[in-house]
Amino acid sequence: MNFDASNDRPLKKRRFFVDDPLDTAVTPAEKSPALDASSSASTHTDPNYSANGSPAQIQTQQEYNFSNGGHATQPATAAGTRTHQAQSPAHDTLSDFDTEAFVSIVGEQVSPETLSQIRKLSDGSLEKAINVYFDGSWKNAGSPGSSQTTLLSCERNASRPSPLHTSREQGTGPAENGADSVTEPISRSKLQPARRYLGAFGVEAWATRSGIGLIKHGDTVNIERARSQPLSTRGRTGKLRVNQKGDVLTRFTNTAGQEIGRLPRETAEWVSTLLDQKICEFRGVCVFAPDRLRVNDTIYLQLRCFMRIEAFQPKELPQKQDDNRATTIFEQEESAEEKQLRLRQVALVQLFDEIGLKSTTQDDEIKKQRKEGLLRAAEMADQEAKKLAKSGNTDSGDEEPAELEQDQLDALYKKAQSFDFSMPEAQPPSSFAMDLRKYQKQALYWMLSKEKDKKSGREVSIHPLWEEYDWPLKDVDDKDLPIIEGINHFYVNPYSGELSLDFPAQEQHCLGGILADEMGLGKTIEMLSLVHSHRNLPPTQSLGNLTRLPVSGVVPAPYTTLVVAPMSLLAQWEGEALKASRNGSMKVLMYYGNEKNVNLREMCSAGNAAAPNMILTSYGVVMSEHRTHQALAPGTSWTPGNLFSVDFFRVILDEAHIIKNRRSKTARACYDLKATHRWVLTGTPIVNRLEDLFSLVRFLRVEPWNNFSFWKTFITAPFESKEVVRAISVVQTVLEPLVLRRTKSMKTPEGEPLVPLPKRTIRIEKVELIEQEREIYNHIYTRAKQTFNSNVAAGTLLKSYSTIFAQLLRLRQTCCHPILTRNKAIVADEEDAAAAADQDSDLKDDMDLQELINRFTATTSDAESSNEPPDPSMKFTAHALRQIQTESAGECPICSEEPMIDPAVTACWHSACKGCLKDYIQHQRDKGVQPRCFSCRADLNPQDIFEVVRYQSPNTTPTEQTPSSIGGDNVYSSSQPPPPPRISLRRINPLSPSAHTSAKIHALLAHLVRVPAGTKSVVFSQFTSFLDLIGPQLTKAGISFVRLDGTMAQKARAEVLAQFTKFETFTQEELDQAESTSAPSGLTPTPKTPKQSSSPSSPTVLLISLKAGGVGLNLTAASNVFMMDPWWSFAIEAQAIDRVHRMGQLRDVNVVRFIVKDSIEERMLRVQERKMGIAGSLGLMGEGNEEERRKERIEELRLLFE
């Protein structure tokens, strides 16, 4: 009978059926020579053997001899002797190999070459030699891909101790001392034998064979793996996939290598892990077995566990960890390495529980709580893995990780935001050129205390993640065990499965933290004050005294702070750093683009007096250089001078929520940056999940919370188990010592606001789509709703979520401009056709009125000068255009309204109200007749109807006046009339698709033309293609603007921000004159010298994409914000608004959010309310199960399609 394909024990068969044919069993008589030989060998080898000892006692002594190379039954007198025996057991035991006994047992002649090979593989053990021979593993022992069913001697040999590397996923190595570049050998492993007894436990195994005399009381059995399947396999794309069907079959065999039975699944699940990962070896003794054995009978075994030396040697994870990224879009799916760690830690916890091994450093209650938490976290991970395997990852929509509600976030921040206003203040040094507010000085004091809190005199204590265990002194039979001098304890990290013989000391706690002040409170300035206040100054030395650097390895950079920020903020950091520093007190290096061609190892070394004080770089550069750093082969004799070759004095991550995904390449790169002090700047430490905070804690290397297994045990698992209050309480404990957070809504004890900011007004303006836009919107909406209804009926709503979401995107784009939903190639062809038509016609989409008057007047003058008869049409055209210019066109010939309302002009230059003219043409077309001019009866083409657009006169501001004109010394100051306002004729229905305006663009222009002089505005949109359409309309309206989006290089972004944030500066005389001529209210220019008043005026509008400019930027030069389209979460929009309404803003801020009436955008506002918790759900009752979250998402979709 074959049981290889089954993991579970078969059901008991009924006894009255005919028994299976009995296998030919080895009779006691046939076995006796081997047993006698083995027994005699054991008796001869073991001086402590008693003549009346039981077989179990004999086996116990054999195991001790086996585990210590045959020479450790008596404690050695010198450590050196024990070290030699542990390292070379084969050398001492090969001479004891009984060849005659081996040949007699196997029953056939064996060649000398084969015999020699088997002796080497078995380390001279007759028992192992028999197993090796019968299972055939000696034939392919050298093949790396062979499947082993028994433990070979090559696995038992203690390999050479490797340097102590600690996985960064745990970040809690037993001997880490803060210097990642220093590696020390595991010295105690040289004293440790290849195997050492740990304990014993009983198990009820089951038989897989039938027979008589197969096994009896006292017989020795070998515990082996039936076969071992890899935890990860390569998929079609070449990427590693986690094998969710882990094989746990564990068999036991007799001394002849025959399989007798298997361990029960509940035991095999963790025993197989310990065998596969070479942590333990098990030897079994039969306690009870039926004389007549049948399949599925219960066999009682006593298993003795021996810890292998390999278990104490660190495991190196693969370098290319990014290949293990799961195919799902969510970050919670575990990788192959994480599954190995999970199985290892669970196996060790179960083993220690079975053998009754207790930690010496913890009481029973704490031990119990830790065990329960570990097993619960592991069980949740296992259930998640099985669920993903069952679904095949085809529908990841239901697997979205639980998110935090707004009130839960408020609860998390409650302790962090309980700011002590009586905290002492710290004054920055004289090299710092700015004046700090009180709360900023308090922040400086807090940051200095975090960085300088070394506590070097404290006593050494064990690492909080590790537990200490004593090696047992007696075995299960109360016999004395060998004592290894100097190794009385071993240490276990149950959260990572690591083991160590060296004492894992508690490392220096985090010398940094999280500065989480709300956006706009000046985190950048606070951090710059810290850079000035706590830094090492390079010594003044000549070039000849420079220290020679090694060609490889990491070099310390004691004078340099590294700042990692989004590309858009690099220029702002550079400007703020120089602005906040006295001349010559700060050297800033921009490490980006072509400026990366420097060797940081040499530039930032301790011997370089010219080392930069601050290096600015982007997250993209860090990720790119980390890839190069990982590609270097281990032991490379050369190290490139990049960011990972330097141990910085301080590392600062700005907008650090970028690394919230712990498995992203950017996050992994940032984890590997080396620095003494580590800081995180973010206004949102937790975006929407608890694991967002873990990534920051891991970067800061806050122990023990930077261990993900520990985090899952005490935070993630309780939260997912609906113990939300407990999980939040633990997170508050983590946050309290790490985070400093103040908000703009805080008030001082005197009742004053923490930061006095001007008033902010947010107004929603409903926009009505024009008829053509509404038709397009209704068409797309109908298709989207049909798709939604059909999927609801079929029950496949979430499987088609991406399709529905794409149609929602089209609806949102239609609200902005219909052209955004059209095929780009077709639009480009229409643009070319419109341009060609403009070239062939005298009528353009947009014509300047003054240029038309000049052209027709010149034609009439030329005719008069040449004595030709004048063209009456030319004279009429010039006259009609002048009437439009002087606004004296009279009453409307259609409605008799005087003056005309929004005058429009036909191609024959007759004027009427725009609304009247459009209705007149539509009336003619409804009657089925060709529209004709209401005045001259000429044919009317709807494409050739022009509206009159009047632009405001150039604003008269102090910057446009010279001091001489103000003082009256210029004789032309009062005689020069102001330039006339610009007027243009613009097609109502342009030929060019991009020239068409939309309801939102029209509403935006209506606001911008009413903006007071000297006031700047910021226009946000998440669609850069929409910004492409807004720009030309601003140009036509005579509004100067600049643009910033994600496609621009860093230097171009810096130039745009410099132009937009540039303020005009005036003299005192100019200010007095401005006040006397009703200067715009709220204008607060800075008095400067007269020569600065001649600088050209800066743009008044900044077009910016929501993603590129939503965070970090300082846009206080503006006071008007226009949000062209809503986002799913208002928090994203609030971040963008806070770029303007922040510290440094002197004017009231007006925010207008354009929302299309009766559209998807109005329903998005209701979704925002749900996400903000306004809908009434407290959320403290837990996130619910998957079915509840599924219903919630379906309800949101229903809300969008009401």
Swiss-Prot record:
Keyword vocabulary terms for this entry: ATP-binding, Cytoplasm, DNA damage, DNA repair, DNA-binding, Helicase, Hydrolase, Metal-binding, Nucleotide-binding, Nucleus, Zinc, Zinc-finger
CDD domains: DEXDc_SHPRH-like, SF2_C_SNF
Enzyme class: hydrolase
GO molecular function: ATP binding; ATP-dependent activity, acting on DNA; DNA binding; helicase activity; hydrolase activity, acting on acid anhydrides, in phosphorus-containing anhydrides; zinc ion binding
Domain Helicase C-terminal: 1003-1198
One biological process term in Gene Ontology: DNA repair
EC number of the protein: 3.6.4.-
Residue ranges, compositional bias (Polar residues): 37-90, 143-152, 952-967, 1074-1083
Zn finger spans (RING-type): 892-937
PROSITE patterns in the cross-refs: HELICASE_ATP_BIND_1, HELICASE_CTER, ZF_RING_2
Basic and acidic residues composition-biased segments: 1-10
Motif DEAH box per UniProt: ranges: 654-657
Pfam hit, one: SNF2-rel_dom
Residues binding ATP: 517-524
Residue intervals of the Helicase ATP-binding domain: 504-703
Known role: Probable helicase, member of the UBC2/RAD6 epistasis group. Functions with DNA repair protein RAD18 in error-free postreplication DNA repair. Involved in the maintenance of wild-type rates of instability of simple repetitive sequences such as poly(GT) repeats. Seems to be involved in maintaining a balance which acts in favor of error-prone non-homologous joining during DNA double-strand breaks repairs.
Protein name stated in the entry: DNA repair protein rad5
Organism: Emericella nidulans (strain FGSC A4 / ATCC 38163 / CBS 112.46 / NRRL 194 / M139) (Aspergillus nidulans)
